[in-house]
Design a protein with these regions (language model features):
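Structured, helix-rich domain cores that form ligand/interaction pockets
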Residues: 3-4, 12, 16, 59-326
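Conserved hydrophobic/aromatic packing and binding residues within compact polymer-binding modules
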Residues: 10, 24-25, 35-38, 315
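DNA major-groove recognition helix of helix-turn-helix/homeodomain DNA-binding modules
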Residues: 46-62
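Short basic helix-loop element that most often maps to the first helix and adjoining turn
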Residues: 8-23, 27
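Recognition helix of helix-turn-helix/homeodomain-like DNA-binding domains
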Residues: 28-45
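Charge-rich, low-complexity segments
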Residues: 26, 46-50, 70-71
Length: 329
């Protein structure tokens, strides 16, 4: 993008956002004089400054820049009766589930409804293990919606039935592209972040084809072996490499295990304030000082806690049949 194209796009988006030049200047920590000169083509903004301005304006004109989802949940129940958990906790008929004579994580068998998996063992210490990965969480939302329930009532039911939360992941979907993952990765690498944990990992994934580079950047903050770490990645680019489309530009995943997962669920059920919980978990762990886009992100005051219910039983049944057929053969 040349400077004239940038100046035109900047002005159009600023006017669409309703921001004055002074308000925009305050958000991104530059002078109003500079904003005026950039907008009128009298000064050339650096590529970094252009990036910050346009990401900020895209955020300001977006109706719903962020929303929150449950992305992973696993719960262990102190019983060997998996069918009872299906009935009492999930509130479902056991006939809806396909039984498999194998399990995961050392479990003897499991029951599945779409991607909702309930694992069972004769060992009382292992108990019954409920696992909802990303697709499983969407399938569970389909069930909850049909039952006129939500995550709050479901999590309460898990605890009422003696469930122990083993893992709880929350995902912030960035719909406007405010989070600049490559820049955050570079700042973290160069000491531009304050973090309780110095462990980090930056991964580039995608396809290289001559000069046509379409790499999705992923930043892990914290140790993957710990009870709390973050995963930030460019979801739209990642999906594009798989020839899939999504409106989600970036995703910020908060991954919690064991004690941290238990504490987060208890806090959520006590306060019914997912916005406060999520931004406390983030700012208590990492900060990017003097970076305006990060300041805008952590100051965001509205984070809808949503459900995106989805279930394709036909695909689930076909996959189950193919899986069992392959194992029998």
């Amino acid at each position: 993008m040349n400077n004239l194209e940038f100046a035109l796009e900047m002005k159009n988006k600023r006017l669409a956002s309703g921001l004055s030049q002074g308000e925009l200047a305050s958000l991104i920590h530059v002078s109003r004089y500079s904003i005026n000169r950039f907008e009128n083509g009298k000064a050339n903004a650096s590529r970094e400054t252009q990036n910050i301005i346009l990401r900020c304006l895209n955020y300001c004109i977006c109706d719903k820049p962020f929303y929150l989802l449950v992305d992973y949940l696993s719960v262990r129940f102190p019983t060997t009766d998996a069918l009872e958990i299906i009935r009492k906790v999930l509130g479902m008929k056991t006939d809806y589930f396909i039984h498999y004579d194998y399990g995961y994580y050392g479990y003897k068998e499991h029951y599945a409804y779409g991607e909702i998996k309930v694992m069972a063992s004769d060992d009382e210490h292992m108990g019954v293990f409920l696992e909802l990965k990303g697709a499983g969480s969407r399938n569970m939302e389909y069930v909850l919606q049909a039952q006129n329930r939500d995550w709050y009532s479901f999590l309460n039911r898990c605890l009422d039935c003696g469930g122990v939360i083993r893992r709880f992941d929350l995902a912030i979907n960035d719909m406007c592209g405010l989070l600049d993952i490559p820049t955050l990765s570079e700042k973290y690498k160069n000491g531009g972040a304050d973090c309780r944990c110095k462990n980090y990992e930056n991964v580039q994934g995608g396809k290289l084809s001559g000069k046509n580079r379409n790499l999705a950047s992923t930043l892990y903050i914290g140790s993957k072996a710990s009870t709390k770490y973050f995963c930030l990645y460019e979801k739209q680019k990642e999906q594009a490499t798989k020839k899939k489309h999504t409106d989600i530009i970036n995703r910020f995943e908060i991954r919690l295990r064991d004690k941290k997962a238990v504490q987060a669920v208890e806090e959520l059920l006590l306060t019914y304030n997912p916005h406060g919980l999520v931004f406390y978990l983030i700012t208590d762990f990492v900060e990017f000082p003097d970076y305006p886009l990060w300041e805008i992100f952590i100051s965001h005051d509205n984070l809808p806690f949503e459900m995106n219910p989805y279930l394709s039983i036909w695909n689930a049944l076909c996959n189950g049949w193919k899986d069992r057929s392959c194992r029998q053969s």
